[in-house]
């Protein structure tokens, strides 16, 4: 079984899969509200398609235990999907290139800090929520609308995540 090594989540490394949502000097930001608030502006490219609308939900993820076997992936072809952690804990992100059916050799694992969210671009293969340590809440912005917007596939060969670093 292929072992996945987790890398730290960065904007550059995650760019082929979507956006990293974080308050960073690397993004456009400016002061508003008479100087009392710093706005980190336009952090994610949200897609909902012509017939969809953006919705905001909270997902409550149960903690995953390592070693963890990655045996399936999913994607949302009609819209993006953003996850922003609310519980102050790191979590894992597993993704694969949207251009082909994912295999274990195509997977990448990222360790996201508690202050980093992710926005999966439409069609990007990803593993469902991978909370760590304790039950964790995530603010989710995704698409509601007609049509099937969730494809799930089993992997022909599984991969294992044994450690965070």
Per-region residue spans from a language model:
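His/acidic/aromatic-lined binding-pocket segments of jelly-roll/cupin-type domains
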Residues: 81-84, 117-118, 129
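Conserved metal-binding segment of the jelly-roll/cupin
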Residues: 111-125
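Non-catalytic, conserved peripheral segments adjacent to functional cores
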Residues: 1-109, 133, 141-142, 146-156, ...
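Short hydrophobic/aromatic-rich beta-strand segments that constitute the beta-sheet cores
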Residues: 92-93, 119, 127, 140
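Ligand-binding loop in jelly-roll beta-barrel domains
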Residues: 123-139
């Amino acid at each position: 079984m292929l072992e996945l090594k987790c890398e730290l989540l960065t904007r550059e490394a995650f760019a082929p899969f979507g956006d990293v949502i974080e308050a960073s000097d690397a993004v456009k930001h400016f002061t508003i509200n008479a100087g009392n608030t710093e706005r980190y502006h336009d952090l994610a490219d949200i897609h909902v398609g012509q017939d969809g609308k953006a919705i905001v939900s909270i997902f409550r993820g149960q903690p995953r235990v390592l070693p963890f076997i990655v045996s399936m992936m999913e994607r949302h072809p009609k819209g993006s999907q953003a996850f922003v952690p609310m519980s102050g804990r790191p979590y894992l992100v597993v993704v694969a290139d949207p251009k082909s059916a994912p295999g274990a050799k195509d997977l990448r694992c990222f360790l996201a800090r508690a202050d980093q969210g992710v926005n999966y671009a439409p069609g990007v293969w990803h593993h469902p929520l991978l909370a760590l340590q304790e039950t964790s809440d995530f603010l989710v912005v995704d698409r509601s609308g007609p049509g099937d917007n969730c494809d799930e596939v089993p992997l022909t060969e599984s991969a294992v995540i044994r450690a965070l670093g």
